[in-house]
């Protein structure tokens, strides 16, 4: 396959050379794989290694290649460090906010083994950011410094370009449900959401206002129960205003009718309360009752995912 | 009766040769240790070149350290040649270890630099080997006593500088501790310069941090004490080489000390390199002073620095010539995952000193 491809390319080069009336100075293509000596980049203590992508690095195990360079392009120096830092990106992958999210993240977390580092192109970064940054912002997480797109090269032949983002959609686009309104049905899923939230409160909602691109949930004065206080003080709960970031124009079935109580989870970010999940309170729901009862017994991981979505990769 | 003068001459010659011998950096010959020598048995220690008996003894009792020290010898040579690539004296004579020329045999400014760099390199390499887990006898450096700063926490694996300094000095200073060898002045100079190298290494220990927060945020930053790269330490020592101080061996009180030759009102500073003998200009080849000369050295026509053709060639002029360079071009990355390149030729104009 490679040989045939190379032969065609060489033939094309010769043809172009003939058309220009002079032999081209370029010759047949050479292929370059892994070499032990690093050409560029910082190598701390050891030259870069080439390792199998382990099965317990689920972010990148299915990316499309099997071996990765260590240290990676985020200066993670051990597999343990890579796994630890990569784990918080799995939920974003599950959200499928862009078809090239995995290609982009893994080009940095588990870069291909070649004789030089291959960075993602700036356009790949910008596409992933355009698709995923609004979702991250909805949960109070800015697009991180380490993924700022100006760090990556303008598109050229030696960077990783958009791979799947060009494919035509197989189905007509449907208006996507608000991220904060995707439902988790199991007790475990609910408790994972509670782990990633600063506070959990059972409350009634008085009204909803639109504020630029956000929705604002104004809490009712009475019938409020703080299930997980976190950073909230007693005074904070007197007048609860929850911001649903980027939630102005997406559907949220739970909020179609404001009667009754809601189970609300959120984070406190720079003095503002951000909604991360909302459920209708259902006292007959056994999963919900179990989650609320055993919330503090659940073993939250130290580096918990910033959100836990119901969407699963297919 | 006639036989005696010959015996006396031989003795005098040996004595003269003996006084100038610089044992302290002969261990850099370890860079030539063949890969086939596994260094996993104590009898391998005798096969190593450039070691005094105390170093052979250290080899036997710290066998697991020797692979790292061989690595350090290579690192020191590479760092020296890199730091001085643009100078007339370009550290090429370091490759002759253990049989140096007079530029490194005598108490010159150049040998001062090499002593300092060697001491820094062996300690640096050992400290890093602790961090990377290559040395079973040591591990990460200690967690510092001071707080790491708001929002930060100590973590990771700090370079074990104290172990590096301890074991590095034990090995590289061993030749200077032997009482019989060399003059006292040379010994003091070499020990001082080695200590300057270690001082530069201590100064290069800095706090490094990484963002370990959720989703790549900097809400949690992990910090550790890490050494700068060896080439940065070498660059620092080169600056000290350029401002090194000539000293003489002079009695002060009941002892003899090294004091600055021209400004003898002050003691020698702990941070300055010192030398006893002035260096030539290294323009012409002169084996009596260990100068290779700059004839046929490449120079930079457009530079204003020490590698400029005027300075490098000492005003003798230079000759241009063209060189054909074959390099990769039109490289392209293909998903997933390989790179193809073409081979391009081009001619470059180079200049060499007359």
Swiss-Prot record, chain A:
Residues 45-162 form the FZ domain. InterPro entries: Frizzled/SFRP, Frizzled_dom, Frizzled_dom_sf, Netrin_domain, Netrin_module_non-TIMP, SFRP5_CRD, TIMP-like_OB-fold. Residues 1-21 form the signal peptide. It is found in: Secreted. GO terms for cellular component: extracellular region. SUPFAM superfamilies: Frizzled cysteine-rich domain (SSF63501), TIMP-like (SSF50242). The keyword Secreted applies. Pfam families: Fz, NTR. Gene3D superfamilies: 2.40.50.120, Frizzled cysteine-rich domain. GO terms for biological process: cell differentiation; convergent extension involved in axis elongation; digestive tract morphogenesis; negative regulation of Wnt signaling pathway; post-anal tail morphogenesis; regulation of establishment of planar polarity; Wnt signaling pathway. The keyword Nucleotidyltransferase does not apply. It comes from the Eukaryota. Residues 178-300 form the NTR domain. Disulfide bonds join 50-113, 60-106, 97-132, 121-159, 125-149, 178-250, 181-252, 195-300. Keywords: Developmental protein, Differentiation, Disulfide bond, Secreted, Signal, Wnt signaling pathway. The FZ domain is involved in binding with Wnt ligands. Soluble frizzled-related proteins (sFRPS) function as modulators of Wnt signaling through direct interaction with Wnts. They have a role in regulating cell growth and differentiation in specific cell types. SFRP5 may be involved in determining the polarity of photoreceptor, and perhaps, other cells in the retina. This is Secreted frizzled-related protein 5. The gene is Sfrp5.
UniProtKB/Swiss-Prot annotation, chain B:
It is found in: Secreted, Extracellular space, Extracellular matrix. Gene3D superfamilies: 3.30.2460.20. Glycans are attached at residues 40, 90, 160, 300, 304. GO terms for biological process: adrenal gland development; animal organ morphogenesis; apoptotic process; artery morphogenesis; atrial septum development; bicellular tight junction assembly; bone mineralization; canonical Wnt signaling pathway. Palmitoleoylation is required for efficient binding to frizzled receptors. Depalmitoleoylation leads to Wnt signaling pathway inhibition. GO terms for molecular function: protein kinase activator activity; signaling receptor binding. One of its GO terms (cellular component) is cytoplasm. Disulfide bonds join 80-91, 130-138, 140-157, 209-223, 211-218, 283-314, 299-309, 313-353, 329-344, 331-341, 336-337. Keywords: Developmental protein, Disulfide bond, Extracellular matrix, Glycoprotein, Lipoprotein, Secreted, Signal, Wnt signaling pathway. Residues 1-24 form the signal peptide. A lipid is attached at residue 215 (O-palmitoleoyl serine). Pfam families: wnt (PF00110). Ligand for members of the frizzled family of seven transmembrane receptors. Probable developmental protein. May be a signaling molecule which affects the development of discrete regions of tissues. Is likely to signal over only few cell diameters. Belongs to the Wnt family. This is Protein Wnt-11. It comes from Mus musculus (Mouse).
């Amino acid at each position: 396959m490679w040989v045939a491809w190379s032969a065609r390319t060489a033939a094309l080069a010769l043809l172009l050379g003939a058309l220009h009336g002079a032999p081209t100075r370029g010759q047949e293509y050479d292929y370059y794989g892994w070499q032990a000596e690093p050409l560029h980049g910082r190598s701390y203590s050891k030259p870069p290694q080439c390792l199998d992508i382990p099965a317990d690095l689920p972010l990148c195990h299915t990316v499309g290649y099997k071996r990765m360079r260590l240290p990676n392009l985020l200066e993670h120096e051990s597999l343990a460090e890579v796994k630890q830092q990569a784990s918080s990106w799995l939920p974003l992958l599950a959200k499928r906010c862009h078809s090239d999210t995995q290609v982009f993240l893994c080009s940095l977390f588990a870069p291909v083994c070649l004789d030089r580092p291959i960075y993602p192109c700036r356009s790949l970064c910008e596409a992933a950011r355009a698709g995923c940054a609004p979702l991250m912002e909805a949960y109070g997480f800015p697009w991180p410094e380490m993924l700022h797109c100006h760090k990556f090269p303008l598109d050229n032949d030696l960077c990783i370009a958009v791979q799947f983002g060009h494919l035509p959609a197989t189905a007509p686009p449907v208006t996507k449900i608000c991220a904060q309104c995707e439902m988790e049905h199991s007790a475990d899923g609910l408790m994972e959401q509670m782990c990633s939230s600063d506070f959990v409160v059972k409350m009634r909602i008085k009204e909803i206002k639109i504020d630029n691109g956000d929705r604002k949930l104004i809490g009712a004065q009475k019938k409020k129960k703080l299930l997980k206080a976190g950073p909230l003080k007693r005074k904070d709960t007197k007048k609860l205003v929850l911001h649903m970031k980027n939630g102005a124009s997406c559907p949220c079935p739970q909020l179609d009718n404001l009667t009754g109580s809601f189970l609300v989870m959120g984070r406190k970010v720079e003095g503002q309360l951000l909604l991360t999940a909302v459920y209708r309170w259902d006292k007959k729901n056994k999963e919900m009752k179990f989650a609320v009862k055993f919330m503090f017994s659940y073993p939250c991981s130290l580096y918990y995912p910033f959100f836990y979505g119901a969407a699963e990769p297919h | 009766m006639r036989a005696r003068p010959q015996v006396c001459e031989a003795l005098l010659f040996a004595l003269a040769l003996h006084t100038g011998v610089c044992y302290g950096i002969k261990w850099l010959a370890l860079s030539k240790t063949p890969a086939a020598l596994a260094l996993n048995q104590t009898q391998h220690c005798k096969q190593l070149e450039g070691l005094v008996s105390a170093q052979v003894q250290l080899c036997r009792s710290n066998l697991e350290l020797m692979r790292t020290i061989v690595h350090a010898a290579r690192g020191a040579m590479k760092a020296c040649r890199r730091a001085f690539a643009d100078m007339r004296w370009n550290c090429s004579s370091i490759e002759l270890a253990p049989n140096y020329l007079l530029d490194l045999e005598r108490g010159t400014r150049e040998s001062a630099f090499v002593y300092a760099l060697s001491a820094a390199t062996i300690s640096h390499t050992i400290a890093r080997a602790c961090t990377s887990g290559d040395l079973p006898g040591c591990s990460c450096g200690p967690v510092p006593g001071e707080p790491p700063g708001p929002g930060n926490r100590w973590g990771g694996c700090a370079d074990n500088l104290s172990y590096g300094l301890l074991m590095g000095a034990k090995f590289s200073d061993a030749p200077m501790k032997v009482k019989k060898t060399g003059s006292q002045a040379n010994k003091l100079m070499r020990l001082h310069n080695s200590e300057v190298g270690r001082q530069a290494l201590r100064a290069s220990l800095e706090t490094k941090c990484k963002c370990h927060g959720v989703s790549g945020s900097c809400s949690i930053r992990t910090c550790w004490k890490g050494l700068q790269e060896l080439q940065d330490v070498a660059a620092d020592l080169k600056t000290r080489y350029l401002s090194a101080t000539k000293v003489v061996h002079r009695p002060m009180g009941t002892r003899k000390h090294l004091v600055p030759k021209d400004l003898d009102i002050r003691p020698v500073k702990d941070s300055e390199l010192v030398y006893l003998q002035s260096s030539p200009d290294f323009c012409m080849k002169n084996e009596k002073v260990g100068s290779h000369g700059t004839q046929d050295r490449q120079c930079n026509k457009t530079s204003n620095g020490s590698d400029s053709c005027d300075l490098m060639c000492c005003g003798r002029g230079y000759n241009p010539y063209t060189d054909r360079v074959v390099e990769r071009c039109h490289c392209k990355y293909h998903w997933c995952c390989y790179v193809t390149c073409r081979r391009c030729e081009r001619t470059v104009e180079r200049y060499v000193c007359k």
